[in-house]
């Protein structure tokens, strides 16, 4: 995950604090 996109990692965690990562969830599914 960190190797794929280290910059996004921080954004992902930040989204969790703000609320549900609706914009990050689809990206994760595609990566998987």
From Swiss-Prot:
GO cellular component, one term: chloroplast stroma
Keywords assigned by UniProt, alphabetized: ATP-binding, Chloroplast, Nucleotide-binding, Plastid
Known function: Activation of RuBisCO (ribulose-1,5-bisphosphate carboxylase/oxygenase; EC 4.1.1.39) involves the ATP-dependent carboxylation of the epsilon-amino group of lysine leading to a carbamate structure.
Region (Disordered): 13-32
Cysteine pairs bridged by disulfides in the record: none
Subcellular location(s) per record: Plastid, Chloroplast stroma
Any one GO MF annotation of this record: ATP binding
Protein's name in the database: Ribulose bisphosphate carboxylase/oxygenase activase, chloroplastic
Protein family according to the UniProt entry: Belongs to the RuBisCO activase family.
């Amino acid at each position: 995950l960190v190797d794929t996109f280290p910059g996004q990692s921080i954004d992902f965690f930040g989204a969790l604090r703000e609320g549900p990562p609706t914009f990050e969830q689809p990206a994760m599914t595609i990566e998987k």
